[in-house]
Amino acid sequence: MPTQAVVIGVDSSTQSAKAAFIEVATGRVLAVGRAAHEVSGAGGARESDPEAWWGALREAVAYGLKESGVPASSVTGIAVAGQQHGLVVLDGSGSPVRPAMLWNDTRSAPQAAALTGELGGPGAWTGRTGSVPVASLTATKWRWLREHEPRAAEAAAAVRLPHDFLTERLAGVAVTDPGDASGTGWYSTKTGAYDPELLDLIGLDAGLLPTVAPTGGTRAGSLTAAAADALGLPAGIAVAAGTGDNMAAAVGLGLGGGGLLDHPVLSLGTSGTVFAATRARPVSPALSGFAAADGTYLPLACTLNCTLAVDRIAALLGLSRDTAEAGGEVVLLPYLDGERTPDLPEASGSLIGLRHTTSRQQILGAAYEGAVVTVLRALDEVLRACGLDPAGPEVSARPLRLVGGGARGRHWVETVRRLSGRPLLIPPTAEPVAVGAAALAAGASTGNDPVELARAWQSAVGGTVELPPVERDTATWSRVSAAIDRAASG
């Protein structure tokens, strides 16, 4: 039974909670508890009950305690990384006024377009926040709520992000971090604070918002007696400020000021995401210029349709996902839930180039290709935001770190390798978000740099898979990219 200090990193994602129990001294993952929660909504709506997140967190921690054999007295800290952008509206008792509007809720697309123009266009927004409003940003959801459900907006005593809500349940304090705050549309990456003019623009009182901690690894407070009783953990252990899921993944992979800078990562999950940690503040309208959890920055591009969309195509075709073949002449853009990058909230899936000889396996392969090209197109923009020339020989040969559920899928890996032409590194952990959250918890409990801790854990654990580059499939790239350009131009 472990006797060394243990921390818990919670990944509260779109559909589940995971709680990773990690030895601080070694980085050894002792157990990962899991619990599901539901997402509801039809059309463009995607909502979830924040109380279900709290229930799933409790269940995941209980499972992890049981499976790891860790005595509760060994746990010294906990931190939450949550799905970004969600709008959580609370009443005076801290209970949700309504279900949370999630990151992939696209109903606020008209509000995003209106807000972009009201401030003076994309450049005005990136100059302040690093990002142009799209339907995923929290500010657009608040504007939508005020227009469509004014009573709910008027009832708000507090406005939180998903991870803020859970951190407050743990520590009893209202706190967020620069990383997750930078995905709201009302936090300025230029000033490092909430932007009063933007809050006025959307009609949001700053008094409803949490305090912004210096970093995600800052100790926000201590586990309250009520939370300790609910979780079976000691009261008084460190609770870190926590961060958003993408920022936590960067920490878990050792990206940041205390680790790797300007090295790209591709995450294949419900969404497809490409990002890198850098010291340069990103201001490109082509991507989201987020702050990172450690005081650096995280230029990031995210697509709405990745593994879940391809799984749906496989189900429609009656195929196993591993039976896919290269798409041949067919192009399938799996934009089943609209799309964020490019910004096409009303888009639907499209199938182009069918022939008599086209097989179901090729159609499925084309879905993989459509999803991968969509997210890889943003890779060059991320590298430029880091101040790099994507075509430079050293930069173009820089390995691409592949994480997320898709990194465990043979055809996902083969498709990324073929269409990127880059060497791939697949880290051993399947849970970089939870590991990153655990590193933040360790930082809060020890005072050490979370990124440095995560790097040390990686070195101790080992097991990274290295795949050399293959010749890039430029024909497929050009064919799919042209279809994306046509979709984006209307």
Region roles according to the model:
Residues 1-98, 127, 228-229, 233-241, ...:
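N-terminal glycine/serine-rich phosphate-binding loop of ATP-dependent small-molecule kinases
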Residues 37-47, 124-125, 175-182, 205-208, ...:
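Gly-rich Lys/Arg/Thr-decorated short loops/hinges at beta-loop-alpha junctions or inter-strand turns
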Residues 105, 220-224:
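Short, glycine/charge-rich flexible loops or terminal/linker lids adjacent to PRPP-binding catalytic cores
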